[in-house]
């Protein structure tokens, strides 16, 4: 049974993460095409379950739903009108500026699903929390992620040099921010 729908866009839906989603998250997290750009360590299913209980960010599964997705479905999905393609999370929203994290399975990179998913998450943050801004980080070598943030109006705010050892090299973390008024203005200009 899929988790509750939190937000829907033109093509993607954000849903709550449920226990049945942990195998998908663990398999995706083990994929080097996802793990290395994010700088994440390998974790087993139990570590995913424990981690989610402790950190409890607003984590959402990114899904494609409805007609047109059957060729993309895996054998482990009960609902054949739903395809899990990634995750968007919001951390630290209760006590400081919220930080977004996101990833999609490599098969859907370049299709615009990431931009739509992150936009839905930004909208969620500004509707749910009384915060003046939202932040996100991307490693300096992750050009696609940096372009995604900039396309939504995020502004580079700083660089944490040699922040983490990722994929055989020390990588800088580029920090981005988006003010509430910038988001509201961008949304209003699209109407």
Role assignments for model-derived ranges:
Residues 65, 138-141:
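Glycine-rich beta-to-alpha transition loops that act as phosphate-gripper elements at the mouths
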Residues 43, 91, 139-140, 163:
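Conserved beta-strand edge residues that scaffold enzyme active sites
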Residues 128-137:
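Conserved GNAT acetyl-CoA-binding A-motif
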